[in-house]
Amino acid sequence: MLFLDKVSKRYADNTDALNGVSLLIKPKEFVSIVGHSGAGKTTLLKMILAEEKPTEGDVTFENINIHKIRKSDMNEYRRRIGTVFQDFRLLADKTAYENVAFAMEAAGRTEEEIHADVPHVLELVDLGTKMHNFPHQLSGGEKQRVAIARAIVNQPDIIIADEPTGNLDPKTAYEIVQILKKINDLGTTVILTTHNTGVVDHIGKRVISMRDGMVVMDSDKGEFVV
C-alpha cells in the first residue's frame, strides 16, 4: 500500500532529518512511530503527505511515486488521507457538526450525504450529544474527538495522527487511542506518531522506533526503544 524506499531528507543547513528510511505499511495496519523530539517522526509524515520531497529515495502509494504525479492526482491522493493533529485545528466559529460538515463540503459531498454521515461519525467517536457545541464548550479530549470525526468522515484509506494525545491527560489519551483502534478495526490504516510510550503500550500493535532520522527498531509485537 505505502512504501518508503531508502528515503533521506537533508535541509539547506546540512541537517539530516531522515537517513535511508525504508518502510512498508500494509492496508488495515495500525502503526505507531515513536521517538524523541528531533527523531524524524514529523518529517516522515510530511513525506507521506507529500508536503516535502525527499533528497533521496522514493515514496510510493499503490505503486505510484507520489512525488512525481500531477497536481490533479495529488489532490486525489490527499483526499485518501485523513489527518489528526495535536492542536486539533478546529474552526472556532463552527459547531462540532459544522466542523465535520465543512470537510465534506470541501470534498464536494451533497447535503444529503452530509446530513447522513456527520451524525454517524460523531456518534462513532462518542460525541453525538455534543454535536451542536462550539469548540470553546468542549474539553480537550472532546475537541480531539471532533478532529478524528472530521478526519474519517470522507472515508479515507489512511488516518495520520501526529501526536494526537500530546495535549491530553492520561485517561483522555487512553480514550482517544481506543477510538483510533476502533477506526482501525473497521478497516482504516492508522499511522500514529508519539513520544508517549504509555500510549504505545495501550495499542499493542506494530511499533517503529526512530532515532536521529533512522529506524532503529520495527516490531510487530509492540516492542520499542527510545
Language model region names:
Residues 57-65, 77:
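Conserved ABC transporter NBD signature motif
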Residues 94-101:
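Short coil-to-helix segment of the ABC ATPase nucleotide-binding domain corresponding to the Q-loop/switch region
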Residues 159-162:
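Catalytic Walker B motif of ABC-type/P-loop ATPase nucleotide-binding domains
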